[in-house]
Structures are given as C-alpha cells and as structure tokens.
Amino acid sequence: MNTNDFDFELPEELIAQTPLEKRDSSKLLIIDHRQKTMVDSHFDHIIDQLNPGDALVMNNTRVLPARLYGEKPDTHGHVELLLLKNTQGDQWEVLAKPAKRLKVGSQVNFGDGHLKATIIDELEHGGRIVEFSYDGIFLEVLESLGEMPLPPYIHEKLEDAERYQTVYAKENGSAAAPTAGLHFTTDLLKKIEAKGVHLVYLTLHVGLGTFRPVSVDNLDEHDMHSEFYSLSEEAAQTLRDVKQAGGRVVAVGTTSIRTLETIGSKFQGDIQADSGWTNIFIKPGYQFKVVDAFSTNFHLPKSTLVMLVSAFAGRDFVLEAYRHAVDEKYRFFSFGDAMFVN
C-alpha cells in the first residue's frame, strides 16, 4: 500500500488549538465498520457503547515537562533540548536545536546551572544522547525548569498544563499525551465502573515519533519508532478473565492498542504480563488479536495512526468517516474530538 492512500483534505481551522472547557463535552463519532454506520454523538455518551463485563483499557503514562531551554557556558549560545526517552540512568535521547553546535563533549547549562547536560553521542536528525548532572531528584528539577512539549501543530499557549494530562496520568515518561484519554473525567470513569465495566491501566511512554510523518511512499519501507510499554500481572489477569467471560477489550487510544497488540502478537493471542520496547506498525492486513473496539481522536493525514484505524475498520470506510467529520466540523488532533470504533 501507498502512503498517499491515507491522505484526506483537512481545513486548517479544524485543527483544535485549545482544549474545551469540559473534557467530556467533545463530540464523538460512533462508527461500526461491519454495519457501515456512523452516528454523531457527544463523548459523555461513550458509556452507552460499553457493556457490563467489558474492560476499558487506558494508558496511565504522564507527560514530562520535557522541553528545556539553556545555554552553552563557553559561548552563551541558546540551546533547546527536547527529552525523547530515558536510555539508562541519567542518560537521555534528546532532540537538540541547534544541533550542529552540540558536538560530543559539549555542555549545556539550565536554570543557573542547577541542571547540566553533557553531549555523549551524536545521532541523526538532530538527535543526541546527553548525560544530566543535578542536585536532588531529577523529576523535581525537570518540573521546575522544563516546559510541556505541545505538538508542532498547536500554536496557542496552554493556560493549564494539566489539560495536556489525562485525569489518571501516573507513570512519568512521555514526550506527548495519549490524547484519546483527555476526554475522560473522574466522574465519567466512576459512572462507567458503576455500570460493571472493568477499568484497566497499562503504560506506554509516548515518543515524538507519534508526530513524525511517514517519509516513504511504500508502507513496507517505513521505519517505525520504538516506545516502552508495560502491562502488570493484575491487569493481564483481568483482561484474560474478561475475554473468557465473553466481554470485550475496549482500548482507549492507539497507544493502548499498540501495547495490547504487541503482547497479543508476542504470546500468540494470549494476554500476559510483559514490558519492553515495541515498534509494532499496525496497517491494513494486520489481524487484531486482543482489541475488540476502541476510542481514538482524529489523526493527521497520511499518519501511521490513520493506518492503524484503517487496519481495524477498513481504509475506505475510515476515510468516509473522516470526510463526514470534516463536513460536520469536528475538531481534529490532540485537543480535538473523538471517534468510537466498533
């Protein structure tokens, strides 16, 4: 298949720049790929799509304030680092600007020198491996000095950084939010649980590769980014019990899908506790092993995320749903509206 097979027209004014005042007041497009139906609804009605005995699976990763502004002590030149992933100890893979000035051995100071970074390796596309030195606890230092790394298509300043976190965000480590979860409120989750739906949490730390456009024409040549995931034994057991009792595994967002399908592929359809790195690329032709339904936001044209949704619901039907969403002025991307895919 070709990357252009997943293109669609998207007016720029439909790219949501700010979150709605109420998380669950966003619109929800409910699609059923077998019946080929589409229903316009609102997100707080997602509870009607869930049955007692189902499992709702959410990614509890927390976005780090991963954008750091500092300067080189020798030249006082300004430097921006974007933390991508913790490789080991105090070493991180980062995206550096301007990268050409940062050679191995270069140092960058942040916040009057409370945090220092030393370049220890050079990667392609402006990537660097840095080692941080600091006093105290790294995450606390980062909270005091770092900024929330909003996606490149959001140009408005975010008034409240917590609006780029889910209400259940817990495990620090992401460079971007698992945005399908931004619609849930604590109250809505309580109502869903009271209906008899099992709330299950996993972790996948979202990397910036999620925004990286597919740069090849042939999908088979695309090099998928790697992200760290983890599913506990308790969560795995709940999901096995749900499946055995005839309930559905309903994933919240593409990150939850990628975690569950990584594990399903690794264990021949069985759901086992597991952790590691995944670069799974789900595209049309993929056979789903764990996920029965899911919610997700509206994604970028030609992105791997549109391809994932198409793998589940069929490319033609998904693009038809996207055209409907454009016609009905749904809001797109991270702060936008959602779809529920049966």
UniProtKB/Swiss-Prot annotation:
GO BP, sorted A to Z: queuosine biosynthetic process; tRNA wobble guanine modification
Gene Ontology cellular-component terms listed: cytoplasm
Entry keywords, A to Z: Cytoplasm, Queuosine biosynthesis, S-adenosyl-L-methionine, Transferase
Pathway: tRNA modification; tRNA-queuosine biosynthesis
E.C. number: 2.4.99.17
Catalytic activity: 7-aminomethyl-7-carbaguanosine(34) in tRNA + S-adenosyl-L-methionine = epoxyqueuosine(34) in tRNA + adenine + L-methionine + 2 H(+)
Subcellular location: Cytoplasm
Taxonomic superkingdom: Bacteria
Enzyme class: transferase
Any Pfam family matching the protein: Queuosine_synth
GO molecular function (one): S-adenosylmethionine:tRNA ribosyltransferase-isomerase activity
Main location (coarse class): cytoplasm
InterPro entries (UniProt xref): QueA (IPR003699), QueA_dom1 (IPR042118), QueA_dom2 (IPR042119), QueA_sf (IPR036100)
Record function comment: Transfers and isomerizes the ribose moiety from AdoMet to the 7-aminomethyl group of 7-deazaguanine (preQ1-tRNA) to give epoxyqueuosine (oQ-tRNA).
Self-association state and partner proteins as the record states: Monomer.
Family statement drawn from the similarity comment of this UniProt entry: Belongs to the QueA family.
NCBIfam families xrefs: PRK00147.1, queA
Record-given protein name: S-adenosylmethionine:tRNA ribosyltransferase-isomerase
Gene designation: queA
